C-alpha cells in the first residue's frame, strides 16, 4: 500500500498582516492533512507489515524566508513529522519518504495572483518520475528524504 500526501496551500505576507482564518487553513492543509491522512492508513499498513508513505513537502521544509513564516513553519513541521514517523513505524515494515521539490511549474501562483517567474521551476513530470522510483524501491530499502529542483534554481 502507498499513500502520497500531496496537497498544499501557499501564504506569503508578513505574519502580523496575515488573516487568522487563512493561517489556520494553511496549517490544516499543509501539516494536519499530512498527519491525519498518515494516521488513517497506518493501521492497514501495520496489519500488512508493509507500506510506503510519501509526503510531497517542499524545500521550504529546510529553508527560511521572510514573508513565508506560516508556510515555512508548516513545511518544517512536515519534515519533522516525516523523520519522527519513519522512526516510529519502521518496525512494522512501513517506510516514510519526505520529497522536497523546489519551485515547480504549476499554475498555483497564477491562481493566487502572485507574479512568479517559472522559468527555473521544475517540471512536475520529473517529480512524478522520482516518486515512481521511490515506489519501485524494494520494501527493505527506505529513502528517508530527497530534494529535487531545477539546476538553475
Predicted regions and their residues:
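Conserved NAD(P)H cofactor-binding loop of Rossmann-fold oxidoreductase domains
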Residues: 7-11
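Substrate-binding pocket helix/loop in short-chain dehydrogenase/reductase
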Residues: 14-15, 19-27
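Active-site loop immediately N-terminal to the catalytic Tyr-X3-Lys motif
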Residues: 16, 63-69
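Active-site helix of classical SDR
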Residues: 38, 74
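Residue(s) in the substrate-gating loop at a strand-loop-helix junction
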Residues: 58
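Active-site-adjacent segment of SDR/Rossmann-fold oxidoreductases
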Residues: 63, 84-94
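C-terminal helical subdomain
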Residues: 94, 98, 116-153
